[in-house]
Amino acid sequence: MSGRLAVVGLGPGDERYLTPEAAVALADAQALYGYGPYLDRVPARAGQSRHPSDNREEAARAAEALGQTAQGVSVAVVSGGDPGVFAMAAAICEQIATGPDTWRTLDVVFIPGVTAMLAVAARIGAPLGHDFCAVSLSDNLKPWPLIERRLDAAAQAGFAIALYNPLSRARPWQFARAVERLRRHLPPTTPVIFGRAVGRPDERIAVTVLETAANEAADMATLVIVGTRETRVIERPVRPPLVYTPRAIPRAVAEAIA
């Protein structure tokens, strides 16, 4: 008899962002799998085994979790944010697609979480108030020229852009290159939001403009939102600014994009 595999989104940090469904799945699991820092956010429970691994070992982690489920173990695989956004849900599906036929019969559920772009947007107003897209700047699984083409297309089409994985120690140059690319298509005054570790003690939100956006404001714990030509900043005397993208696009702007 096989077990059950829950692919669980932990949200961006604080336990307040963990959904009730996710909390139940974590409590019911006999075995927990995930990137070490994410597992550290899950309270230890008696009788549960914990299997931390590196953030570049998603395929092996997914295969091991599926194997344990096939043996009758109740398993939870955790992801920060939402498991379906640059996270473990796709890795699990990839392994099911290429693995043993028996894995296709397993009870697998995907439990959503609050992804970083929504948590950051909520902190600052409504920068994703109109059409938007999400792009990962990591070139571990896709070539950098493809990332550049997607940035070009998104900026030219008038999307607000959420940038995941803006840089790391192994690739410190990529965020600067992405900003350089976006400057070809967007005004220098385009609002840019840096949201780091939302919901955690070291949370930091900063608002700047594309002209001055720099590497120093980002790391792997940062989510960057680049606004559109229509995105606006509301300065407030005793409160942090609000950033929003209007729901309506002026006809002249829409025709220029088309």
What name fits each language-model region?
Residues V73-V78, A126-L137, A155-F159, E211-M220:
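A polyampholytic, Gly/Pro-enriched intrinsically disordered region
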Residues L5-V7, Q156-A258:
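A contiguous loop/helix-start segment that scaffolds small-molecule binding in enzyme catalytic cores
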Residues A65-Q71, A122-A126, I147-L151, I205-T212:
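Short, surface-exposed amphipathic charged segments that create phosphate/polyanion-binding patches used
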Residues V85-A157:
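Class I SAM-dependent methyltransferase SAM-binding "motif I" and its flanking Rossmann-like core
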Residues R56-R61, A116, N140-K142, G199-D202:
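A short acidic, often aromatic-flanked loop/helix-cap motif at beta-alpha or helix-coil junctions
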Residues M1-V108, V114, A214, R251-A254, ...:
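Class I S-adenosyl-L-methionine
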